Amino acid sequence: MRLSYVSLTLAIIFVMAIVHAPETEAKAYPEADAVGEASAVGEADAVGVADPGVGSLLAKAALKILKIVAPAAAEVIANKIG
């Protein structure tokens, strides 16, 4: 048997097992014996430190290079990004 036939055979066996599996049905009882209790307590402290990151540093470097190469384009981009 070649490898491609093995995967096809396993797929057919899997489908046949699903199709011919016995049907089961869940039975629900009318009395409720479940007890539920929930509580939620939360505290959060947010302290943020601004880190420029690599992307921001690369963008600033690219803008500096662009100012040297094409000053008009750099001015337009600088006005758009603020």
Curated annotation (Swiss-Prot):
Propeptide: 27-52
Subcellular localization(s) per the UniProt record: Secreted
UniProt record, GO biological process: venom-mediated paralysis in another organism
GO molecular function, one term: toxin activity
InterPro entries: Pilosulin (IPR049518)
Residues bearing PTM Isoleucine amide: 81
Superkingdom of origin: Eukaryota
Keyword Transmembrane helix: no
Major subcellular site: secreted
One GO CC term, this protein: extracellular region
Tissue expression per record: Expressed by the venom gland.
Record's signal peptide: 1-26
Keywords carried by this UniProt record: Amidation, Antimicrobial, Secreted, Signal, Toxin
Family that this chain belongs to: Belongs to the formicidae venom precursor-01 superfamily.
Protein role: Induces paralysis 5 minutes after injection into blowflies (L.caesar). In most cases is not lethal 24 hours after injection, but paralysis is irreversible. May have antimicrobial properties, like most ant linear peptides.
Protein name: U10-myrmicitoxin-Mri1c
Organism from which the protein derives: Manica rubida
